[in-house]
Amino acid sequence: MSEPAQKKQKVANNSLEQLKASGTVVVADTGDFGSIAKFQPQDSTTNPSLILAAAKQPTYAKLIDVAVEYGKKHGKTTEEQVENAVDRLLVEFGKEILKIVPGRVSTEVDARLSFDTQATIEKARHIIKLFEQEGVSKERVLIKIASTWEGIQAAKELEEKDGIHCNLTLLFSFVQAVACAEAQVTLISPFVGRILDWYKSSTGKDYKGEADPGVISVKKIYNYYKKYGYKTIVMGASFRSTDEIKNLAGVDYLTISPALLDKLMNSTEPFPRVLDPVSAKKEAGDKISYISDESKFRFDLNEDAMATEKLSEGIRKFSADIVTLFDLIEKKVTA
């Protein structure tokens, strides 16, 4: 075999290609769109923290200039101008990402609206309108919303009435996942690594492979969705290692950071399919319901200390980063 042929065979057999071959759709988790083309992901996800990190890079100064210019023209007060500029910045990043990925981009609603159903709906509609004004169809955008009671209800209405596709994020519990499926949202992002972080911190133990609590959580959700025929896509998110990814091969989607995508691309470790719809149907438990019972949803979520703490922490972190992003844009709007 010639050297180029050997090299080609090696690339074809890398762990990333095997993961894709397992049936899992690979998504790039970053705002740094310059780093994703080589991985050939189907979709890309962003969040306030990732956009903030990317916005600080000189490479993306042009996008900020466009957003600031837009903000200045669309707002009477500085506050309005800054908010409009930030919304436009999210759309600018989304537009650039969609030049690279063939599928969809996830763009997040301001995390400070996580407990306000109506404000979340209005912000989602506004973001979609901005995308459409830039020639991007709503079919190519997923609106990311925190999986609070209010967020899930907002997503339900957006999906039903507006045909706006939603990605329910900061999902740490089976309770949240069940309610999202009943709301018929397009996609959920159950977090894996952050669940592992909590258990390691609270027990002092290490968890590997199938014993990883984050992996167990996603498997349970996947099995339940497949058993009861829910069409909501399960997209595992927030990974600490390629080991977590390996143990979820076969799940609908996985959104992975460029650093871990790079590791997968440069590894030839076998990635056999672990999850599949047929065995999932045998493993899931009884059907339950939350979508019309707010008190039951809140109580059962509250019973899960990990999910309650991680949801609160996640909203605080994303809110802090959106405030920092607003401050960064305000300096430019008022300069």
Curated annotation (Swiss-Prot):
Family, as annotated: Belongs to the transaldolase family. Type 1 subfamily.
- Give the highest taxon in the source lineage: Eukaryota
Instruction: Please tell me one Gene Ontology term that the record gives under cellular component.
Output: nucleus
Origin species, per record, is: Saccharomyces cerevisiae (strain ATCC 204508 / S288c)
Name the catalysed reactions: D-sedoheptulose 7-phosphate + D-glyceraldehyde 3-phosphate = D-erythrose 4-phosphate + beta-D-fructose 6-phosphate
Matching Gene3D superfamilies: Aldolase class I
Task: Name it.
Answer: Transaldolase
Look up the signal peptide feature and give its range. none
Transmembrane regions listed in the UniProt entry: none
Keywords of the record: Acetylation, Pentose shunt, Schiff base, Transferase
Subunit architecture = Homodimer.
